[in-house]
Amino acid sequence: MDIKDYVINIAKNSKLAAKKLSYADTNTKNKALIEMSKALLENKDYILSQNKIDIENAEKIGTSKALIDRLTLNDKRITDMAEALIKTSSLQDPIGEVIKMWKTPDELQIGQMRVPLGVIGIIYEARPNVTVDAAALCIKSGNSVILRGGKEAINSNTAIAKIIKNAVVTAGLPDGSIEFIDITDRETVNVMMRLNGLIDVLIPRGGAGLIKSVVENSSVPVIETGTGNCHVYVDKYADFDKAERIIINAKLQRPAVCNAMESLLVHKDVAHEFLPRISSKLKELKVQIRGCAATQKIVKDIVPATDEDFGKEFLDLILSVKVVDSLEEAIDHIFKYSTKHSEAIITENYTNAQRFLKEVDAAAVYVNASTRFTDGEQFGFGGEIGISTQKLHARGPMGLEQLTTTKYVIYGDGQIRK
């Protein structure tokens, strides 16, 4: 069987499963999630052994430490994945929820009801936890899912997918509810992008290159999970202690994720006082600073920033820094370079905070908090399938509700249109 036929067969199985999943009862879906959780814990050693192979392969080709961190599983991360499944099982089922209902002059009772999207294709790279997170949210929201991970994590993903696929069938959901493409050839993605009628939506999760390729080449509708060139702006009215805590957290907690800070903007009135303080701390923590001309005059021994640096998602211990003359210049800089993911202002000035919130165009805009909070779990959604940076259908962390659409249900009593 060639690659095209292989992917089409998987999509057909997923389409059949999606029909049954669309009306599966909540108890069965929750049981499937609980069985998935148990199966992960019972097979922890096997998963770790397969993950070890992926890590060794990554190290052989010189993969960065930050990306290896995204790839790595350990006891705690698998336990966290299992616990997240239990949490998802406890969330309210969105399917069948009537968002609003009204009566027309013709005495028709009309309701707007949540329903699944159908078949969701997830194309992702080096994070094995996505295999579980995506499957869990799709199952709970009544969607079937086709998972296509990257070659970096193929052994980990294959092991996890086999385990959770068997678990959902054991729980009583149809075979095909979770499908996994175990061929890493790029052609599998090309086929998925052309399967209109079999796949309802594609969600790419990964680097800028992957996302751009899917968005530009897919005829199947795409929800774009954007890259994160996230900014923190230190206003002239900033509390320096707050600013330091937020910057250290936003840059260093997990530098290789999309909600990590990549660029620091500092108002000129506080730059001479604040930049030496924060740069000293960042250098201690092994962060490379790439600064504008004004920054270079204040902080010695840093790398000159290029225009490209200000638009780049580093996913590493690298930070671009720019001194700005005003709040307006900070907002304009963000407008020019932002990927519209997460942006933050540090200020004690209410007027400046409100202006930043109103004028900055991003999925999440913060006042005095870390960009690292842009996350489905942190927002109270119980996990996410990705963070959308587009404006149609969904924006920001995509939880269960964002994996649904609606239909109108109409109750009549013999009415005809006159």
Swiss-Prot record:
Organism domain of life: Bacteria
Reaction(s) catalysed by this chain's protein: L-glutamate 5-semialdehyde + phosphate + NADP(+) = L-glutamyl 5-phosphate + NADPH + H(+)
Enzyme class: oxidoreductase
Any one GO BP annotation for this protein: L-proline biosynthetic process
Stored Gene3D superfamilies: Aldehyde Dehydrogenase, Chain A, domain 1, Aldehyde Dehydrogenase, Chain A, domain 2
SUPFAM superfamilies given in the database record: ALDH-like
CDD domains listed in its UniProt record: ALDH_F18-19_ProA-GPR (cd07079)
One GO CC term, this protein: cytoplasm
Molecular function terms, GO-annotated: glutamate-5-semialdehyde dehydrogenase activity; NADP binding
UniProt similarity note: Belongs to the gamma-glutamyl phosphate reductase family.
Name the record gives this protein: Gamma-glutamyl phosphate reductase
Gene: proA
